[in-house]
């Protein structure tokens, strides 16, 4: 049995145990049984590994990885981890099935190997650290000291921390009496430095500003303990074996070039990481600083020894160019390109193709990223054109399109099946599988239809051929092949039923008895259930038929099991498109009539079971909301807001499915504009109307993590709906109220900073809430919703303070604040509750009597006699300083009257509150003392499943992306681990480039294509110029020689995608036109002004930047034609600036910019090489030769380094210099290389 199979079995056991909520002893017993079966299978296979208890290591790796992938930690996982290390807590005597599986050092190594230094992982890291902390202390304080030279420890260290690109899939072996200084010993040196760097990641968390109270974290303390007891000894051991190898006469005992290069790279990385940690460390931590300085000295010695080895090998450099050229020719057929053709006519049922990383990332963009549909469609067009451009000349356009459709189907089916297979990580995560099912059945046919329509309208595209058949011919061929080869995965999509048995039966059918036995081993240990089935095949085929992309007769006659498929399609309930045909209407017209008249919940249910209509429904719903807004029909808007809110909060998938096809801002901006109306709250007699709308607006912002910078001012043509002074330029340039409110929604403003009018309103509301007169109509008229949103935290603060000071008692407080549970005020409840949760965490816990005494309230509250012994404010004498706030929290949240959307909106703050409470183990038991209604367990049960966001669903299910994109072959792919967790930023770009420069990633074709696709598809959704920033931050001189070819290949792939994007955007760019107008206006103004405005004028002309400025020139990208709902006519004119235009999501990077930036890097590197006159000049010259060889190889291989002129010629009207080939060869990198040579 292979290592991968063993890990899969352990992973399945863990997931099933969690799904069935097995107790710790039962889980441990099953794990012991599975480990014994795996060991027996390995003995039968003759498999042997030098690492003792390898199965225990696999179990530790599985559990640690799963914990680190969870945003919400299941307490059962903590019990499982404790049992794994220490055995069952309930065992008596010595029981073989209740003892530990592995040791604490093994779990610690897996934590260090898998942890990412991101704040989102901190809760999981802390949980693991708390479990292993005591065990580490016991290990290091044991009578027998821990030996870093232990063969098992070194073997596991190398397995986890050695760069897999330098390994040949061989498990290292170490003799028991480890004094040998052979070549196998030296292999552990780079892994030791990687171990130190991993510890530094944990230590850096102690100064992370994004973490609350980082100085209290356990993880940095664990890392310090490990560095003291293991790190120092390990580096001393490495120094010893390197010194021995240096003095050895046998060259075979010296490190080879690959290990030496990796060692020097890791030494440089380690020193950089240590310096970064030292800069952020508290100066008071003198012992820790001294430890890091000591490690710096040890690593410096290792680096010096490595450098001496490198200098001894410089004589071999002269032979490298010839050898490299031979290697390049040998690997030419395996070079990463955008060409990926699969002949669907010859594919067999057993030939399931691997999903290419760029296609997997494209699916991630389409489903998980909430940006405009035009942006997503552009990405589809770009990848197809890149595929077509790189295809063989003999390949017809028909076959390219069919293969591309087949590729999209396979990727969507595989991703959907991977998501369905994963048990939900938390309550509410089940919706993610439904979203993917809807995307597979509704989005893929829509994409194919729109791609075909785009090809119909753009005959001038560089496609090298024509389409001779109708679209249905191509998609039918792709569908036939996809249904054939993806049959098992489609079964998973329809029902995740008994996958272990199914896999075992398939393996047995194919004659793979051993594989079948391994697959069914899991089912022998633990049975599986049977969830309901979903008609995925029927939905997909019906959507294709209704989009005129497939024919019913072709499905019945030409598909495998065609008559059964056709019968399943016929058995579906009548589709909405059929309703439209029977009424003689187009589908969008049908929705235009039904959205205003049908009950929203019933129509949503009908649409949910008809995925082929989701795109039209989403677009029509946005148009309808805009129409209602023009008519000031807030009641209709409120009905749909309430229905969509309930759908999202009750586990439905329709809101998330709608957001696949529209940018959340398209729905948010019109609704947010309601808050800017001058008569808001005065034109409607129904309080629930505004409450439903405003709660839905807040939910949209929360669920889709909408940054306030994306909320723009929106106006309608109806003048009655205009905002206050909407004609004034100042108000047009001001941000909408919602944008400012979200930034300060939980702020309780002091009375002293409020205006006289607001202070009067606060006083009137306090009297209305707690007086006898109640809330009058005059008070409502004087308090628009925007004011209540802003003042609600202050009202809570004043009310709670009044109760604490004895002005009102607790019952009166409850009665007054219960108004916020009613429709009249519920929209203001989220901000007030977030303030309340923060206030509870901020308030020190102390007895109420001490608190009142310190506040000078002894006489007015404490000394007042009462018949029942309570205080004057209604609190018992054993209450605490937090009791009033906790009672209010229980009143408003732990009740059926609390709107479900409110719980969603406060979930993040509630999680922070619970974490703060549970972190203080001494204060937590005293929290509820003196409270009548507060119960933390009951509150947590109420909040279970609340707070689900689209990003949380995507991150929780991100394992599908890593496994699918990595081809299911390299589950430890560092690149895809980074890409699935990184958010595009300067820091993220630096991490990627650092890994590339050292050769840790980017060596194989999948990594190269995956990173290029991420830069061109995923990152631009947040940072439009990510690809250009990537090249800008590359320093060629810092790249390891062995990594240069991979970096050059990635840049070449990026250029290929950008050129394809330029080819598919044939129109001019409005953003570029606006930039040009600004530059001309600035130039005109500068002619009649003094030199005092010279800097401003220069800043407005980025196109005139000097070549040696790292900032790219202003591009002239084509504009993606908006063929759907546009804001052009509705968006209010705003004051534009060059900065805002450059940051626009519509701005695109051009191939000319990337090539010019790459040429700049070449010039700088060449100048640096010529200026070096020391011992490093030989190494730099070798790098330059390698760089030249890599670029020349790509140029000779037909890459588009100097061919970008043809695309720019068509899209930007750049005429060639001499025309044809000569012009191209003189304008690209080839000319630069010739000149510099």
Curated annotation (Swiss-Prot):
GO cellular component, as recorded: mediator complex
Biological process, per Gene Ontology: regulation of transcription by RNA polymerase II
UniProt biased composition (Low complexity): 1119-1131
Keywords attached to this entry: Activator, Nucleus, Transcription, Transcription regulation
Ranges for region Disordered: 1109-1131, 1202-1226
Molecular function via GO: transcription coregulator activity
InterPro entries: Mediator_Med5_fun
Main location class: nucleus
Top-level taxon of origin: Eukaryota
Cell compartments where the protein resides: Nucleus
Pfam families per UniProt: Med5 (PF08689)
Known role: Component of the Mediator complex, a coactivator involved in the regulated transcription of nearly all RNA polymerase II-dependent genes. Mediator functions as a bridge to convey information from gene-specific regulatory proteins to the basal RNA polymerase II transcription machinery. Mediator is recruited to promoters by direct interactions with regulatory proteins and serves as a scaffold for the assembly of a functional preinitiation complex with RNA polymerase II and the general transcription factors.
Family (UniProt): Belongs to the Mediator complex subunit 5 family.
Subunit record text: Component of the Mediator complex.
UniProt protein name: Mediator of RNA polymerase II transcription subunit 5
Gene giving rise to this polypeptide: NUT1
């Amino acid at each position: 049995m292979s290592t991968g199979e063993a890990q899969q079995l352990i992973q399945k056991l863990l997931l099933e145990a969690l799904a069935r909520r097995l107790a710790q002893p039962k889980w441990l017993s099953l794990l012991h049984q599975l480990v014994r079966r795996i060991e027996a299978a390995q003995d039968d296979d003759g498999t042997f590994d030098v690492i003792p208890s390898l199965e225990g290591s696999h179990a530790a790796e599985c559990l640690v990885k799963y914990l680190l992938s969870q945003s919400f930690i299941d307490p059962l996982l903590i019990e499982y981890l404790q049992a794994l290390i220490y055995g069952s807590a309930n065992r008596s005597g010595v029981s073989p099935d209740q003892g530990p599986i592995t040791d604490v050092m093994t779990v610690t190594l897996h934590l260090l190997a898998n942890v990412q230094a991101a704040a989102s992982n901190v809760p999981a890291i802390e949980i693991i650290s708390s479990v292993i902390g005591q065990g580490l202390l016991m290990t290091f304080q044991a009578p027998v000291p821990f030996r870093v030279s232990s063969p098992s420890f070194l073997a596991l260290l190398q397995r986890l921390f050695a760069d897999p690109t330098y390994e040949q899939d061989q498990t290292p072996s170490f003799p028991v009496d480890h004094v040998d200084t052979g070549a196998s010993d030296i292999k552990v040196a780079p892994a030791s430095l990687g171990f130190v760097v991993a510890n530094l990641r944990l230590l850096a968390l102690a100064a992370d500003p994004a973490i609350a109270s980082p100085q209290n974290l356990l993880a940095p303390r664990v890392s310090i303990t490990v560095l003291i007891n293991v790190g120092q000894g390990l580096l001393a051991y490495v120094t010893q074996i390197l010194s021995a190898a240096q003095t050895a006469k046998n060259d075979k005992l010296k490190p080879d070039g690959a290990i030496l290069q990796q060692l020097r790279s890791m030494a440089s990385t380690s020193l950089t990481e240590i310096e970064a940690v030292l800069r952020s460390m508290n100066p008071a931590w003198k012992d820790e600083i001294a430890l890091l300085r000591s490690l710096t000295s040890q690593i410096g010695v290792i680096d010096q020894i490595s450098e001496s080895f490198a200098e001894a090998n410089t004589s071999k450099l002269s032979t490298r160019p010839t050898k490299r050229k031979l290697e390049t020719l040998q690997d030419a057929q395996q070079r990463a390109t955008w060409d990926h053709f699969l002949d669907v006519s010859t594919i067999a049922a057993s030939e399931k193709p691997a999903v290419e990383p760029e296609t997997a990332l494209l699916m991630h963009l389409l489903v998980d990223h909430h940006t405009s549909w035009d942006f997503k469609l552009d990405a589809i067009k770009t990848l197809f054109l890149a595929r077509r451009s790189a295809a063989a000349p003999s390949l017809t356009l028909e076959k390219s399109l069919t293969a591309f459709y087949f590729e999209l189907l396979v990727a969507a089916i595989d991703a959907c099946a991977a998501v369905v297979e994963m048990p939900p990580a938390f309550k509410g995560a089940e919706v993610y599988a439904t979203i993917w099912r809807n995307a597979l059945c509704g989005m893929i046919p829509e994409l194919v239809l729109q791609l075909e329509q785009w090809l119909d309208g753009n005959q001038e595209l560089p496609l090298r051929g024509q389409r001779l058949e109708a679209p249905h011919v191509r998609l039918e061929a792709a569908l036939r092949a996809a249904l054939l080869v993806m049959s098992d995965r489609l079964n998973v999509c329809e029902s995740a039923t008994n996958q272990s048995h199914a896999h075992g039966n398939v393996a047995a059918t194919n004659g793979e008895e051993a594989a079948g036995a391994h697959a069914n081993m899991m089912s022998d240990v633990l049975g599986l259930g049977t969830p309901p089935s979903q008609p995925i095949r029927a939905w997909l085929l019906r959507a294709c038929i209704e989009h005129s992309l497939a024919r019913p007769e072709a499905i019945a006659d030409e598909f495998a099991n065609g008559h059964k498929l056709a019968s399943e399609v016929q058995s579906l309930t009548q589709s909405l498109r059929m309703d439209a045909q029977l009424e003689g209407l187009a589908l969008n017209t049908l929705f235009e009539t039904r959205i205003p008249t049908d009950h929203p919940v019933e129509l949503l249910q009908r649409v949910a079971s008809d995925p082929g209509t989701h795109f039209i429904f989403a677009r029509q719903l946005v148009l309808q909301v805009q129409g209602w807004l023009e008519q000031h029909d807030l009641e209709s808007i409120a009905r749909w807001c309430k229905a969509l809110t309930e759908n999202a909060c009750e586990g439905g998938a329709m809101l998330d499915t709608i957001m696949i096809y529209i940018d959340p801002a398209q729905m948010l901006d019109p609704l947010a504009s309601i808050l800017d109306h001058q008569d808001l709250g005065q034109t409607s007699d129904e309080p629930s109307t505004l409450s439903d709308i405003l709660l839905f607006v807040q939910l949209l912002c929360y669920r889709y993590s909408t940054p306030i910078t994306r909320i723009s001012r929106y106006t309608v043509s109806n003048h009655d709906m205009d905002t206050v002074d909407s004609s004034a330029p100042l108000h047009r340039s001001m941000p909408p109220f919602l944008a400012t409110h979200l930034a300060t929604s939980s702020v309780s403003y002091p009375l002293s900073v409020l205006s006289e009018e607001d202070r009067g309103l606060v006083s009137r509301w306090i009297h209305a809430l707690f007086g006898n007169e109640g809330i009058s109509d005059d008070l409502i008229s004087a308090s628009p919703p925007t004011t209540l949103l802003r003042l609600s935290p202050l009202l809570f603060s004043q009310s709670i303070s009044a109760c604490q000071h004895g002005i009102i008692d607790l019952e009166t407080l409850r009665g007054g604040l219960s108004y916020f549970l009613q429709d009249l005020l519920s929209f203001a409840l989220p901000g007030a509750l977030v303030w309340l949760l923060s206030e509870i965490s901020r308030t020190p816990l102390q007895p109420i009597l001490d608190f009142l005494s310190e506040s000078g309230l002894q006489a007015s509250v404490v000394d007042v006699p009462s018949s029942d012994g309570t205080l004057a404010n209604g609190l018992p004498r054993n209450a605490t300083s937090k009791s009033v706030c906790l009672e209010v929290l229980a009143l408003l949240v732990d009740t059926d009257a609390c709107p479900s959307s409110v719980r969603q909106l406060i979930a993040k703050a509630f999680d922070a509150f619970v974490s703060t409470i549970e972190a203080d183990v001494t204060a937590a038991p005293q929290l509820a003392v003196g409270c009548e209604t507060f119960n933390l367990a009951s509150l947590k049960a109420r909040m279970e499943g609340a707070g689900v966001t689209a990003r949380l669903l995507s991150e929780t299910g991100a394992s599908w992306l890593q496994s699918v994109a990595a081809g299911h072959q390299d589950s430890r792919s560092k690149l895809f681990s980074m890409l699935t967790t990184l958010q595009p930023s300067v820091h993220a770009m630096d991490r990627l480039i650092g890994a590339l420069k050292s050769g840790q990633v980017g060596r194989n074709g999948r990594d190269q294509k995956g990173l290029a696709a991420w830069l061109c598809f995923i990152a631009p959704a947040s940072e439009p110029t990510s690809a250009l920033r990537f090249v800008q931050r590359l320093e060629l001189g810092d790249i390891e020689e062995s990594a240069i070819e991979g970096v050059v290949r990635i840049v070449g792939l990026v250029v290929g995608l950008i050129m394809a994007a330029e080819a598919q955007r044939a129109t001019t760019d409005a953003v570029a036109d606006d930039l040009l107008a600004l530059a001309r206006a600035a130039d005109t103004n500068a002619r009649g002004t003094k030199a005092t405005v010279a800097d401003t004028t220069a800043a407005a002309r980025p196109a005139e930047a000097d070549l040696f400025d790292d900032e790219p020139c202003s591009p002239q990208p084509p504009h993606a034609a908006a063929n759907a709902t546009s804001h052009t006519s509705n968006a209010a004119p705003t004051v534009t600036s060059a900065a805002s235009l450059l940051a626009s999501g519509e701005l695109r990077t051009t191939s000319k910019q990337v090539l010019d930036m790459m040429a700049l890097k070449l010039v700088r590197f060449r100048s640096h090489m010529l200026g070096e006159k020391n011992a490093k000049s030989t190494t730099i010259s070798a790098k330059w030769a390698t760089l030249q060889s890599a670029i020349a190889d790509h140029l000779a291989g037909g890459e588009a380094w100097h061919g970008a002129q043809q695309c720019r010629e068509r899209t930007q009207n750049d005429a060639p210099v001499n025309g044809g080939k000569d012009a191209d060869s003189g304008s690209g990198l080839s000319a630069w290389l010739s000149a510099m040579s």
